[in-house]
Amino acid sequence: MSNPKVFFDVSANSKPLGRIVMELRADVVPQTAENFRALCTGEKGFGYKGCSFHRVIPEFMLQGGDFTNHNGTGGKSIYGNKFRDENFTLKHTGPGDLSMANAGPNTNGSQFFITTIKCSWLDGKHVVFGRVTEGMDVVQNIESLGSPNGTPRAKIIIDNCGQL
């Protein structure tokens, strides 16, 4: 079976930026990939649609996925509140890596980040579970709206999302 592909249609201050397509590595991290896939489809009654990228740091990453508090303090997984680190097989090798944000070991929920550079210092701390396959131009546009402290200079929203 092939790995699932999902998408985000993203806007900044209500202006469409385009689509980001991501391949989820269910072959390596099936539980983590399934969590993200189901949050993209919203099939459990909650998910990423309408959620923001609340933290954007140029030359580092874009972070989103807090659909409960909308500020980086919330979110939840399809397995309950938090779930364990599945494995650290995949590494942060360059721009476009999709990885779980966390608050320490075994605290994965719904928050994720997309890297804009190689982030090898995060290997063994954050679970990489996919990669951007289309729309790196959209990722770069979002990155350009970031700031050194992470506060975006625009309201960046996932207007629609799902599985392809």
UniProtKB/Swiss-Prot annotation:
The keyword Ribosomal protein does not apply. CDD domains: cyclophilin_ABH_like (cd01926). It comes from the Eukaryota. It is found in: Cytoplasm. InterPro entries: Cyclophilin-like_dom_sf (IPR029000), Cyclophilin-type_PPIase (IPR024936), Cyclophilin-type_PPIase_CS (IPR020892), Cyclophilin-type_PPIase_dom (IPR002130). Pfam families: Pro_isomerase. Keywords: Cytoplasm, Isomerase, Rotamase. It catalyses: [protein]-peptidylproline (omega=180) = [protein]-peptidylproline (omega=0). GO terms for molecular function: cyclosporin A binding; peptidyl-prolyl cis-trans isomerase activity. GO terms for biological process: protein folding. One of its GO terms (cellular component) is cytoplasm. Residues 7-163 form the PPIase cyclophilin-type domain. Its EC number is 5.2.1.8. Binds cyclosporin A (CsA). CsA mediates some of its effects via an inhibitory action on PPIase. It is an enzyme of class 5 (isomerase). Belongs to the cyclophilin-type PPIase family. PPIase A subfamily. PPIases accelerate the folding of proteins. It catalyzes the cis-trans isomerization of proline imidic peptide bonds in oligopeptides. This is Peptidyl-prolyl cis-trans isomerase A1. It comes from Rhizopus delemar (strain RA 99-880 / ATCC MYA-4621 / FGSC 9543 / NRRL 43880). The gene is cyp2.
